[in-house]
Amino acid sequence: MKPAFTAGELNTYTSPGDVTAVSRALRHTGRRVMLVPTMGALHDGHLALVRAAKRVPGSVVVVSIFVNPLQFSAGEDLDAYPRTLDDDLALLRSEGVEIAFTPTAAAMYPNGLRTTVQPGPLAAELEGGPRPTHFAGVLTVVCKLLQIVRPDRIFFGEKDYQQLVMIRQMVADLNIDVQVVGVPTVREADGLAMSSRNRYLDATQRELAVTLSAALTAGAHAAHLGGAAALRAARAVLDAVPELTVDYLELRDAGLGPAPAHGSARLLVAARLGNTRLLDNIEMQIETPAGTAGPDGDRQYAQSPWRN
């Protein structure tokens, strides 16, 4: 039986086959299908992705809500991840989203892990260091969502910058016909990057969490003095808060290769407050002033690991 679809209302599907059929039918009528993948616990950062998707002329927006077990590493509590489906659907309805895809793990992986996506070497760096299977899980589920929905564009936030870069790599390397759109990080009034993890912070931790964005901002302001200066400025801000356990502070190029001596770069940080792990990053323009160490010195410093 053909799945029902009512234009202008939120239609919720749990079956991959139903979403595929509805998406195909909508494309045949000239609608442009936009996909916003999420794991639920929606906040204004997710809604910024939805609004960016809705701005595309002729678009119909599909938001997937799926807590993907493949991207949780050993020691990470899959069951503890926040699940707020009713609230999420209410938010999507208020935003005028027309399709929500809320599959179960059994529906997404009916044959178990028989076939998965193997990421490239970047998967072992930064976020992949302590979580060696994480990006294989991310890329596998995104690849499946792309096959199920067949969107014209797929939207991701720049907060999870390594994820965005790796999805772009997969789309290019596997010749997947979709445009990957990165949306700038949405922040709280004090600069903290919006994240579903922020709800785990107590009041004191919430005040300290802004240190990450403050450190990145300090680094960006110092970037005109070179990459090493940007890292020193950011490190000084982080060092002033002993409650923070910093996993890494690294300067990379836009594709997360070695940091450039000058030009566009990304400063990335991951740190823990109690049991909550926070991520953030910022784009900056590196300059190399006359008389400084030069490109080799900056590059070596920019790739050095964090030392507490």
Curated annotation (Swiss-Prot):
ATP binds at residues 39-46, 157-160, 186, 194-197. Its EC number is 6.3.2.1. Its main location: cytoplasm. One of its GO terms (biological process) is pantothenate biosynthetic process. Keywords: ATP-binding, Cytoplasm, Ligase, Nucleotide-binding, Pantothenate biosynthesis. Catalyzes the condensation of pantoate with beta-alanine in an ATP-dependent reaction via a pantoyl-adenylate intermediate. This is Pantothenate synthetase. The lineage of its organism: Bacteria, Bacillati, Actinomycetota, Actinomycetes, Mycobacteriales.
